[in-house]
Amino acid sequence: MRAMRPVAHLARCFCASSSVKETRPSIQAIAELRKALPGTSMLKAREALTASRSPDAPDTDNVEAAIAWLEQTRASDGAKREAKVASRVTAEGTIGLCTLSDGISSPGARAAMVELNCETDFVARNDIFGALARDIAHTAAWFPIVAASETSAVLSDVDVAAFLECPIIPFEASEENKHDVISVRAAITSVVARLGEKVALGRVASLAPTSGGSHGSALVCGSFAHGTASAPPAPQTPVAATFASGRVASLLAVQVHGPLSQRIMSRTATTQHNDHDHDRNGDDERKRQLRALARSLARQAAGFPTTSVDAPSATAAVASDASSETSGALLTQPFVMLLPAAGLDPSVNEQKSVRDALELWSNTYAGQADGIRVAALRRWEVGETAARPSDETSFADQVKEAAGLA
């Protein structure tokens, strides 16, 4: 009788082991699920595949059902987590810039800038957080209609509450993210569930392609981001849009008037026949110079504490010129960020203000004194609008204090 016990024990172990092997999700299904939802852990992928199996096929993996289960679980967990961390301060994060068209390569400038906040710099450097900022900025660039429609402003601040309900448009469209469309709010909630910190969309600005142009003029945008903590994952499929992020960023609209806009902003500027190669090459060179000028202006706005395009009055302009090192008006600042590719003499950035340099560039390349002007700009820094109670420390401060770094 005692001799039979080891045999029975082995039989039970064999049956249990066989049962576990039959119900364990396959490596292929786990890999497919993690590819569809980057950042999903092995344990969470296995749990999702097991929990989403059909009663009629308890041993069959269903990746689509697992994706739906994960999204539903994250939405529920994220909502609970959001309620728990709602009172926390989000003074860290990143500012994302997405440009669909700069108005030079193709007519109609279209771009957006967003500030996505979190509690700690650690999360701000996370790839999942960076990818979310990229997708939200891309969505904002596609949705200028949510900006205030009763204004003729070239660059508009978007109502964040309305924007959160928009369907998110992934920066990289692929087969892996073809599952159910979700809103910007839901995408943020999902990331809260995955990262465990409060994540909030601070502000959104969008450049509408039809708002700045008028007869005989064209709109060009320039952008620049500085102090990038971590770049989001590179897209696996080619995309026409560009993205940049950083702790300080600027987005501005440049309006081009006169012969220059008619020559190089038309749809036919780059589609001339071979007998016009000389003119086409000249137009291409002018485009490169204009793009470099717009880039220089964006660098200038980001590099200085810029708050406006120009001083509000002539008296203020004189005062700003007298102390241009701290001037908040872009046009009164010394143009120290001017790139050589813009086509002006390098000494210009040491001798002239931005206003003088633009006038010189207009006379040289645009064919008229007022051929180019800065129509609007935004310059943001991470956390500058964060409200913190005077008697409360942030989660980031608590972490630093616990680590002895405060």
UniProtKB/Swiss-Prot annotation:
HAMAP family: EF_Ts (MF_00050)
Note: This protein may be expected to contain an N-terminal transit peptide but none has been predicted.
Coiled coil: none
Protein's name in the database: Elongation factor Ts, mitochondrial
GO biological process, one term: mitochondrial translational elongation
Free-text function comment from the UniProt entry: Associates with the EF-Tu.GDP complex and induces the exchange of GDP to GTP. It remains bound to the aminoacyl-tRNA.EF-Tu.GTP complex up to the GTP hydrolysis stage on the ribosome.
Main location: mitochondrion
Gene Ontology CC: mitochondrion
Source organism: Malassezia globosa (strain ATCC MYA-4612 / CBS 7966)
Organism taxonomic ancestry: Eukaryota, Fungi, Dikarya, Basidiomycota, Ustilaginomycotina
Tree of life domain: Eukaryota
Gene name of this polypeptide: TSF1
Keywords: Elongation factor, Mitochondrion, Protein biosynthesis
InterPro entries for this protein: EF-Ts_dimer_sf (IPR036402), Transl_elong_EFTs/EF1B (IPR001816), Transl_elong_EFTs/EF1B_dimer (IPR014039), Transl_elong_Ts_CS (IPR018101)
GO molecular-function terms, A-Z: translation elongation factor activity
One Pfam family this sequence matches: EF_TS
Compartments, as annotated in UniProt: Mitochondrion
Region listing for Disordered, in residue ranges: 387-406
Protein family according to the UniProt entry: Belongs to the EF-Ts family.
